[in-house]
C-alpha cells in the first residue's frame, strides 16, 4: 500500500494541479456566499423580529460551499478518467498489480486534497459571508455554538463528493459521462424535484446529496430533512455503493 500511495502522491505533486483545485473550490464558495450574504443583508431592514430570531447566519454564510462541490467532484472524476483515456492506468496496474490497492491509494490522496480544499472553502466562505451579513446586523461571528459542527460537516461533505467522483470515474471511465452524471445528481435533480406535487417535494429532497450538504452546514435544521450527520451517513451509503460497483469493474475489466 505504501508504494501505491507514493505513486499516487507523485501524480498529485505538480503544484498547479492541486493548487488549482483548492483555489477554484475556494473561489466558487466565496463568490456565491458573498452574493447570497449581500442580497440577504440588503433586505435586513424588512425582516421581522421573528425572522431575525430564526435567521441561520451560519448556513447563509456557508451557502457557497455547495457551489464548490462541482469543482471537487470533477477533481475526483478526472483523477481516474484521465488515466484511462491516456492509457496510464494500464501502466499503473503493471507497476502496482493490486488494482483495489491502487484505487484505495487514489482515494486516500485525493480525499486529503479535498479535505484541504473543503477546509479552505468553508472558512473563507464563512468569513466573507459574516463580514457582509454584519452590515445588516445579521452576523453571529466565530463564537456561534453551531459553527464547529457546520464547518466540519462542510469538510466531510466535500470529501465524500470527491470520493464519489472517483467512484463514478472508476465505474463509467469517461470524463464527460461521469461529469454529466455528477452535475445531474448535484445540480439538476434538486430542480426537477420541485415539480413534484405537495409533500412529495420534501420527502424526495431529503435524499438528495445537495440537500444533505445544506443540512450539514446549517445551524437551524429543516424538520423534514435528515439530521446533519444522519444525512452524511446516507451520502456515505451512496458513495459506498458506487465505489463497490466501480471497484468491481476495475478488477473485472481491462483498462
Q: Which residues are covered by each model-predicted region?
A:
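Transmembrane helix boundary and interhelical loop/hinge segments in multi-pass membrane proteins
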Residues: 74-95, 99-100, 107
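Secretory targeting signals
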Residues: 18-77, 103-171, 191-193, 214-237, ...
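Aromatic- and glycine-rich beta-strand/loop motifs that create alpha-glucan
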Residues: 1-27, 173, 186
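Transmembrane helix segments
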Residues: 31-34, 175-211
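Membrane-interfacial segments
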Residues: 39-44, 84, 88, 128, ...
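Junction motif at the cytosolic side of a transmembrane helix
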Residues: 234-255
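Helix-capping/transition residues at the boundaries of transmembrane alpha-helices
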Residues: 11, 81, 92-94, 165, ...
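Residues that define the loop-to-transmembrane-helix transition and helix capping
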Residues: 19, 100, 176-177
